[in-house]
Amino acid sequence: MFIYCLPEESESFHKEILSIEEEIFQGLGLPYRIVDTATGDLGAPAYRKFDIEAWMPGRGDEGEYGEVTSTSNCTDYQARSLNIRYRDDDGKIKFVHMLNGTAVALSRAMVAVIENYQNEDGSITIPPALVSYTGFDKIEKKN
């Protein structure tokens, strides 16, 4: 997901992207947490970044959370290098703010779905939100 917006709108849009990403993982019924990334861990373009980490029971010795999506507010950092500008109401030329969000890091999200929905017999229950797309509700070993 990408957003180009006015500087005064970027915080609000950042929260909106995070809300969309959170809704996706709530819909999948996965345990997750939101991490507000520490400033020292941000890449150069990002002013602020949120990660959503889903619980992955198979990670480590006792399971761990792993990043499945993120959203970054890059303010005008990317706009400056790309020279993306707008003219404000007073006629002044300013740089837009740019934001991005992964939505779903598919390979990592699939790990979380498989590990959280695996049954004792090895079958995997399909999350209810995906059944209408898959056409089935369980993955089972063929006899």
What are these regions (language model features)?
Residues 2-143:
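TRNA-recognition modules of translation machinery and tRNA-sensing kinases, especially anticodon-binding
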